[in-house]
Curated annotation (Swiss-Prot):
It catalyses: (6R)-5,10-methylene-5,6,7,8-tetrahydrofolate + glycine + H2O = (6S)-5,6,7,8-tetrahydrofolate + L-serine. Gene3D superfamilies: Aspartate Aminotransferase, domain 1, Type I PLP-dependent aspartate aminotransferase-like (Major domain). The keyword rRNA processing does not apply. The gene is glyA. The record marks 228 as: Plays an important role in substrate specificity. It is found in: Cytoplasm. GO terms for biological process: glycine biosynthetic process from serine; tetrahydrofolate interconversion. It is an enzyme of class 2 (transferase). (6S)-5,6,7,8-tetrahydrofolate binds at residues 121, 125-127, 355-357. Its EC number is 2.1.2.1. This is Serine hydroxymethyltransferase. The modification N6-(pyridoxal phosphate)lysine is found at residue 229. Keywords: Amino-acid biosynthesis, Cytoplasm, One-carbon metabolism, Pyridoxal phosphate, Transferase. Its cofactor is pyridoxal 5'-phosphate.
C-alpha cells in the first residue's frame, strides 16, 4: 500500500537538495529567457495528480484501454477550451511538446524529400523549421527565407522563393523575431502555389489568446503551439485548425497517435486544461498587455544606452540584442549577466560572424518578469542594470553591485508569494 505522506525529502536527499536549489535559483534570479515562464500552482497540482497513472491510448470515446471515462472528460475539457480560446474548430491536445506537434504535422502532410520554405534559424526561425541539425532539415528539402535590411520578414523574397521552388509547405512562426507577422500575406503566397500554410505560434500563443498579437488560426491550414512560454501552462504541445476539413483533422489525429506517440500524458493534459481556462480570465489579458509593454520599455533603454536591437524594436514579448559593434560575444554576455543573477540566452543574429556556440547576440523576453509583477518602471531599471554589466563586462565589482540589486527586487517581487 502506498502512503500519501511519502515524500522525496525523507527518501532521496540528493535529489531533493537539487530540487530545492532550483526553487531558490528561480526565486533569486531574474528570468529573461523568452521561452521560459512560471506556471500556476493549479497547473502543478494537476501535473502531480493520480492522472499520471492512467494509460489512455486513443482519443475521447475511442480508447484502446478501459477505465477512461474520467480522463475522457479531462481531455475533452482541454480540447473544447483550446478551440474556444483560439477560434479553432479542431484541436489535438496530446502532443508531448511543440516539436512533437510539428513532427506530427510534417508526417501527416509531407513525404521525405518534399520542399519546405521555413524561416532561417539565424534570422529568427526555429530548429524544427528546417535546421540541418534537426529532423526537419534532414528529412525535407528546406529553402530558407529571412528578414530584410529593416529587420522585417522579406515577403517579396519569400514570394519569389515560393514561385521558384514550389514548396509543398510554407512555415510561419519564429523563436527570435520581434515583429508582427502578416499571416494573411503568407497564406496568399502559399495559395498562389497551392502549398500548405503551417504556422508554429509557440512563442506568441499567450499574446494571441489575449488579442495582443494577430491570430494565425483564421489564415493557416494548421497551427501548432507549445502550452508553456507566453501561454504559461505546462510543458507540452497543441495542434489547432479551422475550416472544417475533416480529412485533414483525421490525418493529424492519426499522425499524433499512433503515428508518432503512444499513450498521452493525462496529468499534463489536465494541466493544459487548467492553463487554457486561466487564459480565458480577464487578468490574463492584462498580463499579456503588460508583457508587451515591458518588452518595449526595455528596448527603449537599450537603444538609449547605445545598444543595437535587431528590427529596431519589438511588437511582441521578445527582442534580440546585436552585440557585434560592441565586440562582445553572446556567450560572454550570457555568462556575465548570469553572474549578476540575470538569466538570458546567447543567440545568433543576422549575418552573425560567430558560431552558434558563441554567437554575437542575446535574446531577451519579458513573460517571466511580468509574471512576477514587473511593470515598466522595474523593466527599465532592469535594462539599465544589464547595460551596466555589458558596459563593464570584466568588472566583477559592477556585476556584484547589480547582483545585490537583483536579489533585492526578487525578494520584493517573489515568483510564488
Amino acid at each position: 500500500m502506498l502512503k500519501r505522506e511519502m515524500n522525496i525529502a525523507d527518501y532521496d536527499a540528493d535529489l531533493w537538495r537539487a530540487m530545492e536549489q532550483e526553487v531558490v535559483r528561480q526565486e533569486e534570479h531574474i528570468e529573461l529567457i523568452a521561452s521560459e515562464n512560471y506556471t500556476s500552482p493549479r497547473v502543478m497540482q494537476a501535473q502531480g495528480s493520480q492522472l499520471t497513472n492512467k494509460y489512455a491510448e486513443g482519443y475521447p470515446g475511442k480508447r484502446y484501454y478501459g477505465g477512461c471515462e474520467y480522463v475522457d472528460i479531462v481531455e475533452q475539457l482541454a480540447i473544447d477550451r483550446a478551440k474556444a480560446l483560439f477560434g479553432a474548430d479542431y484541436a489535438n491536445v496530446q502532443p508531448h511538446s511543440g516539436s512533437q506537434a510539428n513532427v506530427a504535422v510534417y508526417s501527416a502532410l509531407l513525404k521525405p524529400g518534399d520542399t519546405v520554405l521555413g524561416m532561417n534559424l539565424a534570422h529568427g526561425g526555429h530548429l524544427t523549421h528546417g535546421s540541418p541539425v534537426n529532423f526537419s532539415g534532414k528529412l525535407y528539402n528546406i529553402v530558407p527565407y529571412g528578414i530584410d535590411e529593416s529587420g522585417q520578414i522579406d515577403y517579396e523574397d519569400l514570394a519569389r522563393q515560393a514561385e521558384i521552388h514550389k514548396p509543398k509547405m510554407i512555415i510561419g512562426g519564429f523563436s527570435a523575431y520581434s515583429g508582427i507577422v502578416d499571416w494573411a500575406k503568407m497564406r496568399e503566397i502559399a495559395d498562389s502555389i497551392d502549398a500548405w500554410f503551417f504556422v508554429d505560434m509557440a512563442h506568441v500563443a499567450g499574446l494571441v489568446a489575449a488579442g495582443v498579437y494577430p491570430n494565425p488560426v483564421p489564415h493557416a491550414h494548421i497551427v501548432t503551439t507549445t502550452t508553456h512560454k507566453t501561454l504559461a501552462g505546462p510543458r507540452g504541445g497543441l495542434i489547432l485548425a479551422k475550416g472544417g476539413d475533416e480529412d485533414l483533422y483525421k490525418k493529424l489525429n492519426s499522425s499524433v497517435f499512433p503515428g508518432n506517440q503512444g499513450g498521452p500524458l493525462m496529468h499534463v493534459i489536465a494541466g493544459k486544461a487548467v492553463a487554457l481556462k486561466e487564459a480565458m480570465e480577464p487578468e490574463f489579458k492584462i498580463y499579456q498587455q503588460q508583457v508587451a509593454k515591458n518588452a518595449k520599455a526595455m528596448v527603449a533603454v537599450f537603444l538609449e544606452r547605445g545598444y543595437k536591437v535587431v528590427s529596431g524594436g519589438t511588437d511582441n514579448h521578445l527582442f534580440l540584442l546585436d552585440l557585434v559593434d560592441k565586440d562582445i560575444t553572446g556567450k560572454d554576455a550570457d555568462a556575465a549577466l548570469g553572474r549578476a543573477n540575470i538569466t538570458v540566452n546567447k543567440n545568433s543574429v543576422p549575418n552573425d560572424p560567430k558560431s552558434p556556440f558563441v554567437t554575437s547576440g542575446v535574446r531577451i523576453g519579458s513573460p517571466a518578469i511580468t509574471r512576477r509583477g514587473f511593470k515598466e518602471a522595474e523593466s527599465r531599471e532592469l535594462a539599465g542594470w544589464m547595460c551596466d554589466v555589458l558596459d563593464n563586462i570584466n568588472d566583477e565589482a559592477t556585476i556584484e553591485r547589480v547582483k545585490q540589486k537583483v536579489l533585492a527586487i526578487c525578494a520584493r517581487l517573489p515568483v510564488y508569494a
